[in-house]
Amino acid sequence: DVTIQVLVQCRPDLIKRTYEACAGAPKVIVHFYNSTSILQRRVVFRADRDEIKKIATDGARKCLEEAAKHPGTRWRYEYSPESYTGTELEYAKEVCDAVSEVIAPTPDWPLIVNLPATVEMATPNVYADSIEWMSRNLARRDSIILSLHPHNDRGTAVAAAELGFQAG
């Protein structure tokens, strides 16, 4: 009983190719992501909040579109607001909620929402506090699996993971 998991940016051409590569697999988790951080919105994308949210929801729609072409596979989804810890908390929730609205998860077919500390920017308790807040405030929470993804830039990933787990 094996499930393949793949990671892909919210870029239509890459999403299409990812589904082609997974064709024939019985079970696949497609983990799609886009950066939502203040810095990357300004410097990398030169885009506002609505434009960044649209990248995420367009990615979710493209995933569903490609999945429909491969009905023999049991598809599941995971979404990451990349650089979550550099993103305003309320905005990260807004983007995750918009993605979950498109994916329409259920308790029996949940969406995984991965919350990465892509760059560790604060102490582990700050990350844990954000996990607790997201856990309490995400829409469709009964149909969401929260995934913690601390990085170890400052040497505190284990502490961030443990505190985040306790918090959410």
What are these regions (language model features)?
Residues 1-12:
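N-terminal capping/small domains of soluble enzymes
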Residues 5, 144-150, 167:
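A short, small-residue-rich loop immediately preceding and capping a beta-strand
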Residues 7, 31-35, 149:
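Short beta-strand segments
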Residues 12-144, 160-162, 166-167:
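Alpha/beta enzyme core
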Residues 150-156:
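Active-site-adjacent loop and "lid" segments of alpha/beta metabolic enzymes
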